[in-house]
A protein has these predicted regions:
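Active-site residues of response regulator receiver
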Residues: 8, 52, 79, 244
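Acidic catalytic/metal-coordinating carboxylates
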Residues: 33, 59-62
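Active-site beta3 strand of CheY-like receiver
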Residues: 44-50, 55
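Nucleotide-binding/hydrolysis machinery
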Residues: 106, 110-117, 189-194, 269-279, ...
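Flexible nucleotide-interacting loop at or near the entrance of a catalytic core
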Residues: 107-173
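Conserved post-Walker A coupling segment in P-loop NTPases
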Residues: 156-223, 233-249, 314-319
Length: 346
């Protein structure tokens, strides 16, 4: 059975977590400081680590940086709050995912199992997970095309975030390519062979939103003559992209928050929750902090979503890409004899 390292200075919490893992059959190693945890990582076989971000002396971020040079084990970070700057930095440093204290048994099992599966499928070369998205870009209209410095920073964050299962939040005006970035995150992740399911939350009537996302059982409501799978289960094993989440009704936002916390859904009309194995990526063109202040968006969901934020600059701020994009679309749509821009047009 897998060997799990817990690094946390709270002895009572550490023992409770260790007992939970031992009940599941795992071998547990414990440490209360970054130095002690790194020592165990150097001297013992470890398959995954669960590390508190807030540790005495050198914190969990230091552990992440140094652990990456010792062993490519997936690290699950523990946070006392739904999100924050340290959580974002941890994901950028390569943390596999994060859990918010108090940790539920269901969330722990689901996250740890994903981490161990990822570790089993990760090549020995640690650079493989951080390869440039361009290396896997298709030529089918869904690739990212840019030479601007602003977009190079986006590409870098895609490379850092792709191999994590953390929720990603893509921000940008309409037309900046938010779905293309979501597809790049999926394509460069360990879920690339799984489905990518995109949902435009702004296009679904409020009364149909829950059935669309979570599915329903036969007879759940008038007109439900058959069972519906729902988008979450359609995306099982892959990525669910919720576009324009800023337009989602408050009632549905509460259920999305529960999915992020528990990794399970309850179809409309069902009596029992069902586990789901999906990475959630969301996007919006709206100002979510303002929506939170106005009561149109849940503050707790907002904090849960901004673990890995990516902001996309509009084309007017990267004018050097205009010619590049024009030539790209001419090649894409030109068939066997694509046209080229004349010198005058360029």
């Amino acid at each position: 059975m897998a060997r799990i390292l817990i690094v946390d200075d709270d002895a009572a919490f550490r023992d409770s977590l260790a007992e939970m893992l031992q009940d599941l059959g795992y071998t547990v190693l414990q440490a209360e400081t970054t130095d002690a945890g790194l020592h165990r990582l150097r001297t013992e076989d470890v398959d995954a680590a669960i590390v508190d971000l807030r540790l005495p002396g050198e914190d969990g971020l230091v552990f992440l940086r140094r652990a990456a040079r010792i062993s490519p084990v997936p690290c699950i970070m523990l946070t006392a709050y739904a999100s924050g700057g340290n959580t974002i930095e941890a994901m950028s440093l390569g943390a596999f995912d994060h859990l918010t204290k108090p940790v539920t048994r269901a969330a722990l099992i689901e996250t740890l199992e994903r981490a161990l599966r990822r570790a089993a499928n990760t090549p020995d070369n640690p650079q493989a997970a951080g390869a440039s998205p361009a290396a896997k870009e298709p030529v089918d209209g869904t690739e990212l095309v840019s030479s601007s410095e602003a977009m190079r920073q986006v590409f870098k964050r895609i490379g850092l975030a792709a191999n994590s299962d953390a929720t990603a939040l893509i921000l940008g005006e309409t037309g900046t390519g938010k779905e293309l970035v979501a597809r790049a995150l999926h394509r460069n992740s360990g879920r690339a062979t799984g489905p990518f399911v995109a949902v435009n939350c702004a296009a679904i009537p409020a009364e149909l939103m829950e059935s669309e996302l979570f599915g329903h059982v036969k007879g759940a409501f008038t007109g439900a003559i058959t069972e519906r799978t729902g988008r979450f289960r359609e995306a099982d094993g892959g990525t669910l992209f919720l576009d324009e989440i800023g337009d989602m009704p408050l009632a549905t936002q509460a259920k999305i928050l529960r999915v992020l916390q528990e990794r399970e859904i309850t179809p409309v009309g069902a009596n029992r929750a069902q586990p789901v194995n999906v990475r959630i990526i969301v996007a919006t063109h709206r100002d979510l902090p303002s929506a939170v202040k106005e009561g149109r968006f849940r503050e707790d969901l907002w904090y849960r979503l901004q673990v890995v934020p990516l902001w996309l600059p509009p084309l007017r701020e990267r004018l050097g890409d205009v010619l590049l994009l024009a030539e790209h679309f001419l090649r894409l749509l030109g068939g066997d004899s694509p046209k080229r821009l004349s010198a005058a047009a360029a």
